[in-house]
Design a protein with these regions (language model features):
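Extreme N-terminal "head/tail" segments of very large remodeling/mechanoenzyme assemblies
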Residues: 1-57
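Phosphate/anion-contacting hairpin/loop surfaces
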Residues: 15, 41-262
Length: 262
């Protein structure tokens, strides 16, 4: 499955105890969309900002690096090597992660830099910010005429994407559960209803909710009785509590002995 915002939150919850305080010894860029941070303690943090599988994870895979490091890699080495990761934050319930790194420059002055991963499909990006959130550089530069008000260029101040007008399981759990209970129009599918109205809900999660409520992944709200709508609301309530409390149960789907989804 794609790394949706809820799954990303779970991954970060697992990574923080291992990464907070870790010293960055090396920075590598084995591919255009990939950065690998080699951390003290023999940890390798892969940050993939590609359009197909954007993600962040620990890895044991040794990737071949180009003979000449790309410009972004050299910039990251200049600002991050020798620094320590002090914070890892997820913006709202979005697929945006900020790694805060405290380091000492050539003059012996302490400062912070931020490495921001926007794991947003074809719009995925990786940005290096200074302590004032000014962009030092990014993996994909975006001009004004392409993105409208949100350009991503060196020298500009970084801005988060415009918030989506959706309910969050974290900031408004009661409203989210009540909306799930009321539901949408009779001909609207549960999957589409959930995708259009809730932050962090991926198509796979939406179909799972629909199946648990109506025993079909493409069930429409008009086909749900009161008990099934209450089941949907309860599923939302349980999920909201689990996410807020960081209570996760990772699952891997195997087919013929090979992992095919998670």
């Amino acid at each position: 499955m794609p790394l949706d915002a809820i799954c990303l939150r779970a991954v970060l919850h697992e990574l923080r105890p291992q990464l907070i305080g870790a010293r960055i010894d090396k920075v590598q860029q084995p591919a255009r969309d990939q950065i690998v941070l080699l951390l003290r303690g023999n940890l390798r943090l892969l940050i993939n900002a590609g359009p197909n599988q954007p993600r962040v994870q620990l890895t044991e895979v040794l990737r071949e690096n180009p003979a000449e490091p790309p410009m972004l890699c050299m910039l990251l080495r200049k600002h991050l090597v020798g620094g320590r990761i002090t914070e890892i934050e997820q913006s709202r319930l979005e697929r945006i992660v900020t790694f805060t790194v405290r380091s000492v420059n050539e003059l012996g002055e302490s400062g912070t830099k931020k490495l921001v991963l926007e794991a947003m499909g074809r719009r995925s990006n990786l940005l290096l910010l200074d302590e004032d959130d000014r962009i030092l550089d990014c993996m994909r530069r975006v001009e004004f005429e392409v993105s409208g008000a949100r350009a991503l260029l060196p020298g500009l101040y970084y801005q988060l994407p415009t918030p989506l007008d959706k309910l969050s399981l974290l900031t408004d759990p009661e409203g989210a559960v009540e909306l799930a209970r009321r539901g949408g129009g009779a001909e609207e599918t549960v999957e589409r209803f959930l995708l259009d109205r809730y932050l962090g809900v991926s198509p796979l999660i939406a179909r799972e909710f629909a199946f648990r409520a109506g025993h079909e992944t493409d069930v429409r709200f008009g086909a749900l009785n009161d008990a099934q709508r209450e089941t949907l609301a309860q599923e939302f309530s349980d999920t909201s509590n689990a996410v807020k409390e960081d209570n996760y149960t990772p699952v891997i789907l195997y087919r013929d002995g090979k992992p095919v989804d998670f």
